[in-house]
Amino acid sequence: MQLSITHPCCWTLRLLLVSNLLLWENVALVPTCLVRNGRCFASLEEMLERAVGLSEEISKQALQLFTEFDNQYAQSKQLINKNFKKCHTSSLELPKPSSTSVQTHPITLLKIASKLLSAWKVPLNDLVNNLPSLKDIHPNILSKAREIEAKSAGLLEGVKSILIQMQNGDTEDENYPGWSGLASLQSENEDDRLFAYYNMIRCEGRETQKVETALKMVKCKISNENNC
């Protein structure tokens, strides 16, 4: 006997089919992730992609910050003629482009990036808090410094999350160079104070590029690219 399409049995089958289609549709929309302790984490590749993108933004803004500060103060105060002081994180170097860098483990590179970001957490906070004391400081310089501080803090948390994932949850206390430049930023001598800011902003731009390079090297190694 042929059943009518309006027969209750047919309606039940149709409802089941629609329900199954909707179920699969919802499953397809749920992003894939790694589940640990009942929580959903982004994949390692996704986390690295975000970290690299954020590090590029920070490097770009750090260069803009230095350029604007240089244009406003360096020429008139002859800051460019002074000898730059060593950056407080200069000891945290990346492996040089050679066979050694190829053999460097991604975790080692991530730890260098983490130490650099940690070592600049206090200096960036001091920079943001003390920049307003400079005479005729441009609002763009202040806003860029604040953005760099906020994004660097976010990137540090991201790098730590990547390290936790790669080390299966294992964490360890990290030692990084301390910052002792606050007194120079608050010097009563205007020229000395300006040079302290100038040197610090230059160092910050240099070290953000290190972080960017380290993260790109990690991404390259994880992706098994040949030109790392």
From Swiss-Prot:
Pfam families: Hormone_1 (PF00103)
GO cellular component, one term: extracellular space
UniProtKB keywords: Disulfide bond, Hormone, Secreted, Signal
The UniProt record lists the keyword Nucleus: no
Signal peptide location: 1-29
An MF annotation (GO) of this entry: prolactin receptor binding
SUPFAM superfamilies: 4-helical cytokines
InterPro entries: 4_helix_cytokine-like_core (IPR009079), Somatotropin/Prolactin (IPR001400)
Signal as UniProt keyword: yes
A GO biological-process term: response to nutrient levels
Main location group: secreted
Compartments, record wording: Secreted
PANTHER family: PROLACTIN-2A1 (PTHR11417:SF12), SOMATOTROPIN,PROLACTIN (PTHR11417)
Family that this chain belongs to: Belongs to the somatotropin/prolactin family.
Entry protein name: Prolactin-2A1
Organism this protein belongs to: Rattus norvegicus (Rat)
GN (gene name): Prl2a1
